[in-house]
Amino acid sequence: MFPFQPMYPMQPMPYRNPFAAPRRPWFPRTDPFLAMQVQELTRSMANLTFKQRRDAPPEGPPAKKPKREAPQKQKGGGQGKKKKNQGKKKAKTGPPNPKAQSGNKKKPNKKPGKRQRMVMKLESDKTFPIMLEGKINGYACVVGGKLFRPMHVEGKIDNDVLAALKTKKASKYDLEYADVPQNMRADTFKYTHEKPQGYYSWHHGAVQYENGRFTVPKGVGAKGDSGRPILDNQGRVVAIVLGGVNEGSRTALSVVMWNEKGVTVKYTPENCEQWSLVTTMCLLANVTFPCAEPPICYDRKPAETLAMLSVNVDNPGYDELLEAAVKCPGRKRRSTEELFKEYKLTRPYMARCIRCAVGSCHSPIAIEAVKSDGHDGYVRLQTSSQYGLDSSGNLKGRTMRYDMHGTIEEIPLHQVSLHTSRPCHIVDGHGYFLLARCPAGDSITMEFKKGSVTHSCSVPYEVKFNPVGRELYTHPPEHGAEQACQVYAHDAQNRGAYVEMHLPGSEVDSSLISLSGSSVTVTPPVGTSALVKCKCGGTKISETINKAKQFSQCTKKEQCRAYRLQNDKWVYNSDKLPKAAGATLKGKLHVPFLLADGKCTVPLAPEPMITFGFRSVSLKLHPKNPTYLTTRQLADEPHYTHELISEPAVRNFTVTEKGWEFVWGNHPPKRFWAQETAPGNPHGLPHEVITHYYHRYPMSTILGLSICAAIVTVSVAASTWLFCKSRVSCLTPYRLTPNARMPLCLAVLCCARTARAETTWESLDHLWNNNQQMFWIQLLIPLAALIVVTRLLKCVCCVVPFLVVAGAAGAGAYEHATTMPSQAGISYNTIVNRAGYAPLPISITPTKIKLIPTVNLEYVTCHYKTGMDSPAIKCCGSQECTPTNRPDEQCKVFTGVYPFMWGGAYCFCDTENTQVSKAYVMKSDDCLADHAEAYKAHTASVQAFLNITVGEHSIVTTVYVNGETPVNFNGVKLTAGPLSTAWTPFDRKIVQYAGEIYNYDFPEYGAGQPGAFGDIQSRTVSSSDLYANTNLVLQRPKAGAIHVPYTQAPSGFEQWKKDKAPSLKFTAPFGCEIYTNPIRAENCAVGSIPLAFDIPDALFTRVSETPTLSAAECTLNECVYSSDFGGIATVKYSASKSGKCAVHVPSGTATLKEAAVELTEQGSATIHFSTANIHPEFRLQICTSYVTCKGDCHPPKDHIVTHPQYHAQTFTAAVSKTAWTWLTSLLGGSAVIIIIGLVLATIVAMYVLTNQKHN
């Protein structure tokens, strides 16, 4: 038949039914949304396939059996093949006996997956069930020679040897443990602390491990699985399951595991339930029974089943009871098991619609509520009609059924239209809820046409697209980045939210009343009852009937009212429906299409064009959508900015050496650091020096230049004044004496003519001929003054730059203490000098530093939902409010609301018609997915992930920075901490929302205010201790229709989401990175970490075994200061022998990149270093020898870099020698002028005084 042999044997053809099934009706498809429908269908099918395994397909014809097996299958001996097959078919389809029926209820075992097979094989002799009353209540497993069993699991281990062991209790970990006998230790599990992120195996398949949490798909694992092990691919136990909690589409597991030190740790998510198989009991007529096994079910006794559900509505096992009541025992499960079918307990209803085609009306498709809180553009509606059920209450997809004056009718869902400003696309419906995707609009309208009548209902609601992320886009992009968001689930999974139901009240149905002759006849529907009230003349009739009855006293239909009564169906507890008389039986059903965590594609704005300047960055922005730009400084004061950019713009920012960060839209953060660079040349001419230091230190440079200018000005002015004063004092006596002869020296000093010498040359000639000593003194005085001033200035003004020593360079024999900066990625190198031993190098690099605060959850807040009871209406009588016990519940009695025979109640009285209105507050249906958590933060613990190298031994370890907890590796004992700075970015009160942390001073529990954060508060998402304060006020209803009007403050949670500032992720100081699960800050560049080493002797090397240098010379080949290892030093040496030597700089002038170098007997070694000094001069230690390295460094060329500098940033660049030379020269010239003036003044004064005494 085939030209080749198939690789695998062909499967038998499936069984074909000879009777063709009726063809399904064809419905036209909606072309514009075809791609969307295919995508949603694929997603739904994937969910169903992943979360449950479908039933096996119908069996095909039996495969061809070997001849030796044929006699065993033939019971009649001489029957042929056809007869044999007919016998099989008959045996399969015939009426089974009770034993066979009980056996058929059991599904055939499905073939487990690869992971399950592996775990089952390993569990067979290492895991033992714990039995309680004949049922498996949990499991115990043997790991590492010890028996572990959960402490909350009661019962006896199904092994005589293990059951006889005496166990010890560890209540902190919810475990009991004991040592197993020696003969059983060979067949035990091995455990491991290695847990890389990925998938692991347990009894039910795959377990995902991510961010320190184990999760499984929802529905996988349940009560009775406590104690089961989770294994890796090598069959080692990584955790033991204790319980779980549903979180949307996933279930988080509570587990016990081991850390790197082999210490047991326990992780328990919030609201976790223990998975011991404890039977939940329910109540019926004062008789208890297991909730999963009710004595009645809905298909057999509907009214009694609803009453049973109402009694147990607050029972923890209500979901089990509801599921069992809907699926009667003995019924075969179908592939739609995951889709709850509980809405067959309800029926549609007619309610008042505020806006129909013309005014208000009593509509079969009244819209009760509209929600659009997701980020995917979908809308969830709650209506009075129902979806997924036909008129008989059976499951039927893509169908809507509605109530038309007591008659339930159905219509295909594609004939129902929904639109806002434009038509919507209806995705699916379930129960009272409809999921659709709608364009933006201020109202939403639903309508359908039946025959020639069009039914419609509109409600005001602003439908808009809610973008996620930091760009305000209006339509999902085709390409972009994936970001966590909240989307409406497209399935009817049980996610823990409920909608309240109750038995419907009496509803007027005029179609039940007819006129037969001159009498009124009331005919109730088959199987239902009707309440008849008539007022005929002076006769009042009030009677309940279940079959047609004629009332001869009444001759007009208007004299009677017929109310339909139904106690076998629930309806939604709507304020548009009247409440049933007496005690109303309430229930609750699950809400489909809830918000769930998902991934959304968000747009990426065009990358900004970045221009770097001197300590500045310029961003040229071109957003396509309004985009947020957030910046912060990575210093102690973040000085953050947060701006929404809608148009092309240019923004300029200052960048410092401590760093600067900006976040543009949905792009990841980018960080920049400034380098110590500037124009000019610190080793050049004066104007180049001034330009360089003006850009680096503008204020200091201006101040220094101002001081120098003032000194020069004062010097010139003082010298001039002194010279003039001396000249006047010297010449005045001679000017007052007639014919006085002025001495030659005085004439020269005072620039005055003598009687004998007319010119300067004549004066010098006179001194040369008459007094040569004075001649040489006159010439040497200025030169001597210049020499003296120059020497004085050299001693006074030559300032040595101040450098701070970073830390100790050596240590004692066994112990070494040092301090390293608390900054991730920056290496710290040092050596340990010990007498008689070679220096031991130590290198430490922190890869990550975590700061984890101790937090206490105060409460959870979210959107609130206003619950309204159907109003209790009493005609011809009064009512009172019953005591209130629900959150923010309001109750009020209104009298005279409904007039005689008109309005919603159709009362027969004109007065004393009362209505009791009740409203209260509850958590929204989507509170589980969309909520904020208010925490109080306390003392924080610090963890440092260090890469440590001691000598030639390296290790990556985690250290608790508390000064107490040591870490041991290769015999080295390391103790870190405590931090030099007790600092945390978290305030005392913090709020966690959508994976981000906010410092927010929230109100205390029980002190919330309307319209503000905390207006509703609950201790946990699932707890029932709800506090609410929403300013709920009931208003008087109008007579036209039954309703409960009210006013209420807007949601404080929603207002807080609109007004909240940027989270700590964008505003934390010191460049902290903020994360959740657990709440923590990482890589905060603040403070320093003290380290204490205790090093064993084995790691030291004798000095005789290491080389020694006989000659060494260091030259700086290249040096760029304030740059990442921008210096290169070459050391030429002669060594005693080849070997490896530690290198170190004892001072803090330079930071070396290398911790050790390889030496030969003669050669050179190249060493890279970083320095912040313009003229570095440091001693370099190589083994036990020292060599001095010095030279000049130039500023870096790049103004801005994308990584922090790996040198000690506490050192600032010193003033260059060239600058000191120019400054000394400037100040020296000014001082010479002053000293010359002082010398002249002194000589003149001495001469004048001597001359006066002589005279």
UniProtKB/Swiss-Prot annotation:
Q: Where is this region: Functions as an uncleaved signal peptide for the precursor of protein E3/E2?
A: 276-287
Positions of the region Binding to the viral RNA? 91-127
PROSITE patterns on file: ALPHAVIRUS_CP
Q: Where is this motif: Supraphysiological nuclear export signal?
A: 41-48
Q: Which residues lie on this side of the membrane: Extracellular?
A: 276-701, 758-769, 813-1225
Q: What is its EC number?
A: 3.4.21.90
User: Any miscellaneous information on file?
Assistant: Belongs to the New World alphaviruses that can cause fatal encephalitis. Structural polyprotein: Translated from a subgenomic RNA synthesized during togavirus replication.
Task: Provide the protein name.
Answer: Structural polyprotein
Species of origin: Venezuelan equine encephalitis virus (strain P676) (VEEV)
